[in-house]
Amino acid sequence: MTQKLLYVSPVESFVDTSFFQELSRLKLDIHGLSTSQITIHSYLDLKNIPSVSSACHLFLDQQSFNSEDICASSERVRLEGKLYNCNSLEEFKSLDKQQYLAEQGQKIYTKALEDINSAIGFSIISFADLKKYVFYYWVCTPLFQHENQQISILDGPEDIDASFNDKAKVWFTNHYSNWVAIVLENGDINEYTKGLNTSSIRGLLIRDTSNKQDMPSAFLRNFITIFSLDYPEAKELDVFLMRSSTIKSIKLRIRLSETEHTKLKFSGWERNSLSKLMPRAVDLSALIDPLKVAEQSVDLNLKLMKWRIAPELDLDCIRNNKVLILGSGTLGCYTARSLMAWGCRNITLVDNGRVSYSNPVRQPLFEFSDVGKEKAVAAAASLKRVFPLINAKGVQLDIPMIGHPVKDENNERKHFDALVDLIKSHDTMFLLLDSRETRWLPTLLGKFYDKIVMNAALGFDSYLIMKHGNIDDNFGCYFCNDVVVPTDSLTGRTLDQMCTVTRPGVAMLAASQAVELFVSNLQSRGQENVLGECPHQIRGFVNNFTTLKLQSPAYDNCSACSRHILNEYNKRGWDFVKQALNDNNYIEELSGLRRIKEEVENMELEGGEIKIIDSEDDGFEII
């Protein structure tokens, strides 16, 4: 009888783009620098095999990382595998591929000695360049065979008769997780087991993934190797290759050569599109929706912080925090960009002005083409041009100012209600306005509604950053060191007083430190945290390049955050605000500042000594 060697059809893989997207997410968010192998799953669609393919594809997609997402059936078989993701391209290149294949093959072989249905699996080595969105990978399906063993075809291939074919289909439908069964001499199909009488075995029934009429799948070698160990006396047997595709199921009569079961040899690396034994590379930057690429890429540097430098950093609390920026000028623009860099996704900007010709060179969210546009709206549009998926809104709004009497109550009441709604719907408020009286009402509302308030103010060569607002905090607000109530400081200003006259770098310093203080505060709500300290105030001086960390307590007679003011606002709402705007003496009387001034004056008349702390100087504890 003429014998010919058995040739097999290699396994092919198909890796969907969603697989790499999920891999990049897991690498960034969970695995970090870990190179431990992770378990993944694939499925083989035995029925729908492309006509141009030599075998059904080992399909990998996003669901491969969660076994529960892959449903198995008689025609859709689930397969377990391993993924080894390298930390650098150099590590990927230098990895001993043959040793890795042998190690994975040995593990599968060991499992198969206990259960022949575990004789097949797969492994992937990869490197994900998350900056360029290029993925390098190589798939292997470890195949093993004893070095001196040969498998010869004695007869066939020939078609399986219809009655046995139907019986085999029913058996695999009822045992869809099995790959192999034993066919007895009487034609019965039994689940594979060891210890049967060799003379009672006619052959093996194997689920076949090949799409070639006269050639079985490469997995056959693994099954035959295990069978030859379990039944060493069986030298000839029939192999029934069951197929679910349009290709007919076939039968082969094979012979196993006389050999000692010595060392195993391993193969199984997949060839690339040029039929070379080489890894593949796929550049997804041009294939995936650019918005999806941007969504993952904008947080890349932040997530890399968690790998080694700050593993406990909470990025979600920053991402989900809704930030309201009052003032869309120089401070507002730099603050918004810094918030974006920290991953903040919800930013609302408020202003009542329009972009002037002097703005674009100092305020980075504006260009020459924006001149004349509403500042807040133009700034929000600029943020969306930088990152289209950010939830940025611009609101044109006049904030009612203490010391400026109400002229159009309906209009000012409408702006007041809008401001209250904005503050209530956000978590944090940045006060970046250009006058003290404009900051008074937002400071009051921030304290009343228990919001985080980040305050920043500029001088010519100095700046102040402070956090306040939360009811639980006993720190002073922007007005707690004032002994006078804010009044109209805008009327009668000269040009140099109407414009922000400050050294250009001061705004960048103030905005960046305000955002850093905000982020540190979110990590611990006031205590030392993974990012370091979280001071109450920061005062910077560019003339001598020094910075002071300061702390001052809340003032019982503060014109903005004292209980007298908050209680009255709680009772009267807009009527209270209207009276405060119209009557310069009302807040001074209500807060108790008038009484304190009178007591001071009386002490001076009586010859006593008292030192009045100026609101612009000391009164702080240096920490």
UniProtKB/Swiss-Prot annotation:
It comes from the Eukaryota. Disulfide bonds: none annotated. InterPro entries: Atg7 (IPR006285), Atg7_N (IPR032197), Atg7_N_1 (IPR042522), Atg7_N_2 (IPR042523), ThiF/MoeB/HesA (IPR045886), ThiF_NAD_FAD-bd (IPR000594), Ubiquitin-activating_enz (IPR035985). Its main location: cytoplasm. Keywords: Autophagy, Cytoplasm, Protein transport, Transport, Ubl conjugation pathway. Coiled coil: none annotated. One of its GO terms (molecular function) is Atg12 activating enzyme activity. The active site is at 499 (glycyl thioester intermediate). The keyword Transit peptide does not apply. One of its GO terms (biological process) is piecemeal microautophagy of the nucleus. GO terms for cellular component: cytosol; extrinsic component of phagophore assembly site membrane. The keyword Transport applies. It is found in: Cytoplasm; Preautophagosomal structure. Belongs to the ATG7 family. E1-like activating enzyme involved in the 2 ubiquitin-like systems required for cytoplasm to vacuole transport (Cvt) and autophagy. Activates ATG12 for its conjugation with ATG5 and ATG8 for its conjugation with phosphatidylethanolamine. Both systems are needed for the ATG8 association to Cvt vesicles and autophagosomes membranes. Autophagy is essential for maintenance of amino acid levels and protein synthesis under nitrogen starvation. Homodimer. The GxGxxG motif is important for the function, possibly through binding with ATP. This is Ubiquitin-like modifier-activating enzyme ATG7. It comes from Candida glabrata (strain ATCC 2001 / BCRC 20586 / JCM 3761 / NBRC 0622 / NRRL Y-65 / CBS 138). The lineage of its organism: Eukaryota, Fungi, Dikarya, Ascomycota, Saccharomycotina.
